[in-house]
Amino acid sequence: MTANSIKFTIAFNDPDLDAEEKDEQVQQLISELKQIDEVDTVGRVLDPSPPEGNKALGGFLVGLLMTEVNTANAKKLMGFLGDRLGGKAIELSVEANGKKLTVKAHSREELEAAIKAAQDFIAA
């Protein structure tokens, strides 16, 4: 992460969805984010302590994705997320300038408030 980049971690945490459904939402959003020029990186979040005996090259945490953008493109990304994630239960973490903000949203209104809080946080 460079000095002028902002890291977003998005967790799909709808209790009505099983792990596979959360994973489908992550895959769909990753695919959409990869098509946006302003996004520097996007991907799954690696499990820091995969289960013993896991043969995969590092497992992923279910329902989580991470994306990075530069400061100038953060507002565009948040607008995109607002359009795509309205009405979904998520937790959004924003990391910038060595500080971290985490907000939860369960509706479009809460998501808009969360995005506004994230924008204010980045601007501070």
Say what each PLM segment does.
Residues 1-62, 80-124:
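Short amphipathic alpha-helical segments that predominantly mediate membrane engagement
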Residues 58-67, 71-75:
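Compact, glycine-rich, soluble single-domain proteins
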